[in-house]
Amino acid sequence: MPVLKVNGSPHEIDLPDDTPLLWALRDTLGLLGTRYGCGAALCGCCTVHADGKALRSCVATLADVAGAEILTIEGLGTAATPHPVQAAWLEIDVAQCGYCQSGQMMQAAALLREIPKPSDADIDAAMSGNLCRCGTYSRVRAAIHRAAEFI
Amino acid sequence: MRFPSLILAPILAAATTIAVTAEEVTLPQDEVASLAAFDRLVAVIEHPRCMNCHTSTDFPRQGNARLRHNMGVARGPENHGTPALQCATCHQDNNAPSGVPGNANWHLAPLSMAWEGLDRRGICRQLTDPARSTMTPEQLVEHMNNDPLVLWAWNPGNDLNGLPREKPPMSAGEFGELVRVWVANGAQCPD
């Protein structure tokens, strides 16, 4: 049975290889922090990390991520020791409705892993695929700069 | 020297005489064969399935209308997107049922292989100029016959509306053979 490594733990997954990763995370593993938005990699809502890189889990199949270390919002940090992005998100009070925010934070964390002190242009380039109906973009940008200060 | 492309199509036996505006010029058979092959294969190069990622811009295009790629997607330093928004963030190993196209090595062609904005003569010059092209003619034969990302053009899947993407105007095999003929006869470019 295929093994999916999520947030540091291996999980045996009895699903077809062409199952989207998001389905396995939410429906099989019960990790509901990763959200379904568009199902076509158009909104960024379902962003997770695969081996440290941002990945849209709604279009990546289990075959695509075979052997990869998957990180979801549940594994990014804890309440006691939040990831700098999560700490900054709380401090800036980024979220409005919150639906897209786990994807926003995972994308931001991927950016900071690549560019620890990003410019506004770096942030725009990295975050332009993460949509927010509430229009929290200016707070997202501010929070990423704040998270960079924490790192 | 100038001559219309229409007269290049016939297969010619030996040396060929072509009427031009001011004089008659005799072309060797191999040169005629090469030019005739290029005249046909370039229609594939100009097709959106190829041209959308052989852009001269800092971003790819998408669709037959060749619109700028959604979501501000950019070329990035290695032609694989920006550091945190790579092509592989969305494009996986295979075409997705949702309509997102896929290939294991999805990326933009480097600017040294940009064809966008060039006419057919310019495309040919770009392909064959050692100072600009990153591939030798022999490497072009390999690339255009066997590169899985090139061959994706003939397996482009459905778009986001569920409609089949248009394929280039000839088969992959025919295109590959024309590239072979073009290169084997000197990789000639139209004047």
Language-model features, listed with the residues they occupy:
Chain B
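N-terminal export/targeting leaders of redox proteins
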Residues: 1-42, 62, 73-78, 95-191
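Short, well-structured alpha-helical interface segments that form or flank functional binding sites
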Residues: 36, 48, 82-85, 174
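N-terminal, post-signal-peptide region of Sec/Tat-exported proteins
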Residues: 46-80
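The canonical Cys-X-X-Cys-His
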Residues: 48-57, 84-94, 179
